[in-house]
């Protein structure tokens, strides 16, 4: 017996519990796809806002200090940018990163949820906000995050200001992800056939890169001498601090130790997390596809 088609209420409930949506929006009426998509957006995001409001009632997050977010962010990411990019490119990259951080608060969460371009990401941001309140999350499998990086924006929890791990810095961690999410042209840098993204980071090494940058940034911030850098790196490696399944904590500790012993540790981190083979540009993928089609026709 065929299953009954999902109703709008079914789709909203599924979205709230899993973050998943029907890309065709089949449950919604409308004159064509765009009409259905607009109706679905209104119902799904409206339901998300109402559920977040319900779960957050009576709760509050860590207060934000009266600080200039741009100045705070620049101070955190500038050493990383200076160490990873040639001098002629540093100002353009810094201009993007210093404006990249958005702290999720009770004041801005609803607007962000309604305006975000992707349903799944809006759901993740909702859970990030709820976690900062100590509230129940939306679903059993909802991620418990303190930060999320998308394109050139880093969403960060107010818990950033309550973090007591001396080697943690969510801003640096999320900013490090921008380097593989953002194309050079986006920040005004010249692209070439082999240089399309800000940095070439191995796909399986992206979290390793971010965790290594995070820890090394804190080592540099705290150390006053080369010997202190090495001692702090050893201290970092003495305790398992990462629970992320995609990352080997021992590998990160080794990278941080090697970086701390080098003149420019940022270059060490980049080299250790580089792709095993140079990634192809979108143009090269297109050329390969055309060549494959032509070869198939000649057979």
What are these model-predicted stretches?
Residues 181-198:
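Flexible internal linker/loop segments at domain or repeat junctions
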Residues 18-153:
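Auxiliary, metal-adjacent structural segments of Zn-dependent hydrolase domains
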Residues 156-171:
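Short pre-active-site segment immediately N-terminal to the catalytic Zn-binding motif
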Residues 174-177, 207-214:
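Histidine-centered, metal-coordinating catalytic motifs and their short helical/loop contexts
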Residues 41-52, 57, 203, 214-299:
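Long, well-structured alpha-helical subdomains associated
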């Amino acid at each position: 017996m065929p299953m009954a088609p999902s109703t709008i209420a079914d789709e909203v409930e599924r979205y709230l519990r899993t973050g998943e949506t029907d890309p065709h929006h089949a449950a919604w009426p409308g004159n064509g796809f765009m009409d259905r998509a607009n109706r679905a957006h209104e119902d799904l995001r409206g339901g998300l806002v109402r559920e977040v409001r319900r779960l957050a009632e009576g709760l509050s997050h860590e207060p934000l200090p009266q600080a200039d977010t741009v100045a705070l962010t620049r101070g955190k990411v500038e050493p990383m940018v200076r160490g990873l990019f040639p001098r002629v490119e540093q100002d353009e990259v810094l201009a993007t990163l210093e404006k990249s951080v958005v702290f999720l608060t009770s004041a801005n969460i609803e607007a962000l949820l309604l305006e975000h371009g992707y349903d799944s990401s809006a759901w993740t941001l909702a859970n990030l906000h709820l976690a900062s309140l100590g509230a129940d999350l939306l679903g059993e499998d909802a991620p418990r995050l303190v930060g999320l990086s998308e394109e050139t924006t880093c969403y960060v929890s107010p818990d950033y200001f309550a973090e007591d791990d001396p080697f943690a810095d969510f801003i640096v961690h999320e900013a490090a992800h921008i380097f593989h999410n953002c194309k050079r042209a986006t920040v005004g840098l010249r692209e070439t056939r082999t240089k399309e993204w800000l940095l070439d980071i191995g796909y399986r090494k992206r979290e390793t890169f971010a965790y290594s940058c995070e820890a090394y940034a804190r080592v540099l911030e705290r150390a006053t001498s080369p010997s202190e850098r090495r001692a702090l790196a050893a201290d970092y490696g003495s305790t398992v601090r990462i629970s992320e399944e995609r990352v080997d904590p021992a590998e990160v500790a080794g990278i941080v130790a090697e970086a701390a012993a080098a003149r420019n540790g940022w270059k060490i981190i980049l080299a250790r997390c580089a792709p095993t083979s140079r990634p192809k540009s979108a143009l090269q993928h297109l050329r390969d596809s055309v060549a494959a089609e032509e070869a198939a026709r000649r057979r």
